[in-house]
């Protein structure tokens, strides 16, 4: 079952102005501009750009990942692309790995697939026996119980370039700072929400990251089936990580239906990999 709605369209000028104003409250240096998209193949992506017929999709959710009755659920994002009229597309985003493709392991998935040329640049990260992070190529065209995917024709067009340096505010997450900047400065009301997606690099500095361990290694109850959400921490954290990281992000300021779509509560999903190793 697929439920659909439309996000409100704002001009790139309004979006960039909102980001410039809002992000300046959290970072020492902020430069937001509208530019021609660089050739993303130079960034190791399987497509040149991220423009044309843009759609985002929120697949599954926490119950499909953590409810014992639903663990192991898998979704074919190539089949989903056909259902939404994006079968010839570049798909990027963040999700969980399909356990059937990982010998039963859990994994954090960077979705990076060209469904036009069949090129795959996806990466999976999982927790090893000694709690080390293992990152490797992933070529399956399906993901696990949740995924946030951006579908586009993959052509080059105008994009918003954001350059930031030096955090001065309390918000530690760039994507959450972006969501707040958009909400505050676009003065969103009446469910006139906006969604953005794209690729960014961490050139300097380090970040805190996590990978979901295998279910058998989580020794406590962390999911409440009545609330249909996780109520205790269960992730394996790694810090500091970086720099030279490439991130793939889908974010939105809210549900354009007012809540009927039951979108991911965080309002964003971002996964990354090293671009030098």
Identify the role of each PLM range.
Residues 260-277:
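C-terminal structured interaction module
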